[in-house]
């Protein structure tokens, strides 16, 4: 067990319930940790509704790893059962239900992407569970017991439900079951702490209530912030194009991270690295480069990160790509959302739409050094493209500006 607890608060938005000055382990997570009589069970549930994980997701897994390093057991719950419903939190419409095959395929991809973050090797540090183990076998009597622990009013107060109800948008009964099933996960694995984003407080609180209902000691909730994406305004999301995927190649990852807006750099260092926040470089450009190098090293190794840094530098400083020689194109002249082939044809490179499509399909178009391979990829908003460079072939470059 570590005797330094600074890791607990770093990047943490809220712990509940929490009276940090108290010595009572029932109301103070720090007191529970300092008690040290046994490893705590730290629950994190993930619903594999997609195949990719991005840096916004990584925040919570980094915190889980910190608990592992402090000697506790990470209980990673793969929501193979709940993913078929989908978490309705914050959603303005019903989620598409996935097949069991979809979920299993996504889960395997998730676990592969998590290997650079979590400790999969040390005995007792990681427990991987699938919530179909206990949810698939629930009989009607048990389901009615779960439903009896909450009121319709409590459910409608949940983010997303009330908005849809007020607008007359359907809210289906199976969606009401989602927070109860997530809460029952906490009963099944007897978690001491549950990690989640700030949008998960309701669901985690339901878990506390259900643990109390079934005679267990209620878990603590530890909430982590939602990472703002590369556009500097909206949460990181693949659909918005403002993300950095964990499975991206080193150069693509580096090129994106060295352009993180200045206003976000401090948050990115706090949430995505272990760098001493008091010892960061004073020069903003140097901070961006250090951030990119650190994060890429975590997922690709130091050697690959250094190579990516060199390649990125050559991209903007080589004889054909002097930064000052790259023309700029205002994104205000592009209609969004925009498909990739339309974007490439619209930014002053002298290509028709059909030519742009062929160039993309032939692998001749890059965005910040990463190949664009789908001419129909949709860029939702211009903010995610600010400052990025489109390259066609070896000699055509344009920098996108707002």
Curated annotation (Swiss-Prot):
Biological process according to GO: tyrosyl-tRNA aminoacylation
Motif ('KMSKS' region): 235-239
Domain annotation S4 RNA-binding: ranges: 338-402
Pfam families: S4 (PF01479), tRNA-synt_1b (PF00579)
E.C. numbers: 6.1.1.1
Protein localization: Cytoplasm
One cellular component (GO) term of this entry: cytosol
Motif segment ('HIGH' region): 48-57
An example molecular function term from Gene Ontology annotations: RNA binding
UniProt-recorded name of the protein: Tyrosine--tRNA ligase
Organism (species): Synechococcus elongatus (strain ATCC 33912 / PCC 7942 / FACHB-805)
Gene: tyrS
């Amino acid at each position: 067990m570590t005797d330094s607890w600074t890791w607990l608060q770093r990047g943490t938005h809220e712990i509940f319930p929490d009276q940090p000055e108290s010595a009572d382990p029932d109301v103070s997570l720090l007191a529970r940790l300092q008690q040290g009589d046994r490893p705590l069970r730290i629950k994190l549930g993930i619903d594999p509704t997609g195949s990719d994980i991005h840096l916004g997701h990584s925040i919570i897994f980094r915190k889980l790893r910190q608990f592992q390093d402090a000697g506790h057991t990470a209980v990673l719950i793969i929501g193979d059962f709940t993913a078929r419903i989908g978490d309705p939190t914050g959603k303005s419409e019903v989620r598409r239900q996935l097949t069991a095959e979809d979920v299993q395929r996504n889960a395997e991809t998730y676990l592969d992407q998590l290997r650079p973050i979590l400790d999969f090797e040390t005995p007792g540090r990681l427990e991987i569970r699938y919530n179909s183990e206990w949810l698939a076998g629930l009989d009607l009597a048990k389901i009615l017991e779960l439903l009896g622990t909450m009121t319709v009013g409590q459910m409608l107060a949940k983010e997303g439900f009330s908005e849809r109800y007020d607008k007359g948008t359907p809210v289906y009964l199976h969606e009401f079951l989602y927070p109860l099933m997530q809460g029952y996960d906490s009963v099944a694995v007897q978690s001491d702490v549950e990690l989640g984003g700030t949008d998960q407080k309701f669901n985690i609180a339901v878990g506390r209530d259900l643990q109390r209902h079934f005679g267990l000691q209620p878990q603590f909730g530890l909430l982590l912030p939602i990472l703002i994406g590369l556009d500097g305004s909206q949460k990181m999301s693949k659909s918005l194009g403002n993300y950095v995927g964990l499975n991206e190649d080193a150069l693509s990852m580096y090129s994106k991270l060295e352009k993180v807006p200045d206003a976000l750099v401090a948050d990115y260092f706090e949430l995505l690295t272990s760098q001493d926040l008091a010892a960061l470089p004073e020069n903003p450009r140097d901070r961006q480069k250090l951030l990119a190098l650190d994060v890429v090293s975590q997922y690709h190794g130091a050697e690959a990160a250094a190579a990516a840094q060199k390649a990125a530098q050559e991209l903007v400083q080589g004889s054909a790509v002097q930064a000052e020689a790259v023309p700029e194109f205002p994104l205000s002249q592009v209609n969004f959302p925009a498909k990739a082939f339309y974007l490439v044809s619209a930014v002053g490179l002298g290509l028709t739409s059909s030519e742009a499509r062929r160039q993309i399909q032939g692998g001749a178009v890059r965005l910040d050094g990463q190949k664009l391979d789908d001419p129909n990829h949709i860029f939702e908003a211009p903010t995610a493209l600010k400052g990025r460079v489109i390259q066609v072939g070896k000699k055509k470059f344009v920098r996108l500006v707002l």
